[in-house]
Amino acid sequence: MSFFNFKAFGRNSKKNKNQPLNVAQPPAMNTIYSSPHSSNSRLSLRNKHHSPKRHSQTSFPAQKSTPQSQQLTSTTPQSQQQEASERSESQQIMFLSEPFVRTALVKGSFKTIVQLPKYVDLGEWIALNVFEFFTNLNQFYGVVAEYVTPDAYPTMNAGPHTDYLWLDANNRQVSLPASQYIDLALTWINNKVNDKNLFPTKNGLPFPQQFSRDVQRIMVQMFRIFAHIYHHHFDKIVHLSLEAHWNSFFSHFISFAKEFKIIDRKEMAPLLPLIESFEKQGKIIYN
């Protein structure tokens, strides 16, 4: 379900590594939603399946502030004063500045695109969109992956007041370099979407009871990667003239999350000023 066909992008690490950021580089891919990237995460994306019809009772429970799972993370708490400070500081951030904050590939909102189509099973619709979001985000991360080095980004964060900690196998919170965190998150998501017990592809197999919970966790991890890229690598996105593609992709992602109430608003705090701007512009509309 790739709704956009537009200019190619990509990176050839051997070619781009030695070129300065102010040198325009030719695109390397036909579409940004059709080809896997060659990032350091080394994920192998599964082939797209046409899932059979099935009936599910998918619903998303209210979000809780408790840790999400052994494989996922928790954030450092933010006080209202810190959040207000971040909002003030964020006014100077590139992705909130003109003209970038208004740049988009798609005019109007994604409301009709994210709504559940008639006669389509909710679980099928959720699964399809989650897989597409993951595939596209995986590609976008490939554009900036070579710049996400442990020396440059020793912690995974989304701005000055939001740090993301990984919960290891012993349920201990550990601070990781952004590159390691993102690779672990993408690998974890990749394993989830390729788990046929969680994302069944055979006719007649229902979605499991934990499907909604795992979808919430997958979407939260993807949001955190969005947040890191916006706060630290938006200049690379602009350098490649991909800000319209990126903003539209994020608007699509958030519209879907809001339509089905998948991500809690508190989790969106690092990008809330941007989301609110998109809402005012009519790019994000929800009930």
Swiss-Prot record:
Keyword terms: Cell cycle, Cell division, Cytoplasm, Mitosis, Nucleus, Phosphoprotein
Chain positions found as Phosphotyrosine: 33
Basic residues bias locations: 45-56
An example molecular function term from Gene Ontology annotations: protein kinase activator activity
Compartments it resides in: Nucleus; Cytoplasm
Phosphoserine PTM sites in chain numbering: 59
SMART domains given in the database record: Mob1_phocein (SM01388)
Region annotation Disordered: where it falls in the sequence: 1-89
Transmembrane segments: none
GO cellular component, one term: mating projection tip
Family stated for the protein in its record: Belongs to the MOB1/phocein family.
PANTHER family, alphabetized: MPS ONE BINDER KINASE ACTIVATOR-LIKE MOB
Misc remark: Present with 2250 molecules/cell in log phase SD medium.
Function comment: Functions as an activator subunit for the CBK1 protein kinase. Part of the regulation of ACE2 activity and cellular morphogenesis (RAM) signaling network. Required for coordinating polarized cell growth during interphase with the onset of mitosis. Required for mother/daughter cell separation after cytokinesis. Also has a role in the prevention of nuclear export of ACE2 from the daughter cell nucleus after mitotic exit. It coordinates ACE2-dependent transcription with mitotic exit network activation.
Name of the molecule in the record: CBK1 kinase activator protein MOB2
Source organism of this protein record: Saccharomyces cerevisiae (strain ATCC 204508 / S288c) (Baker's yeast)
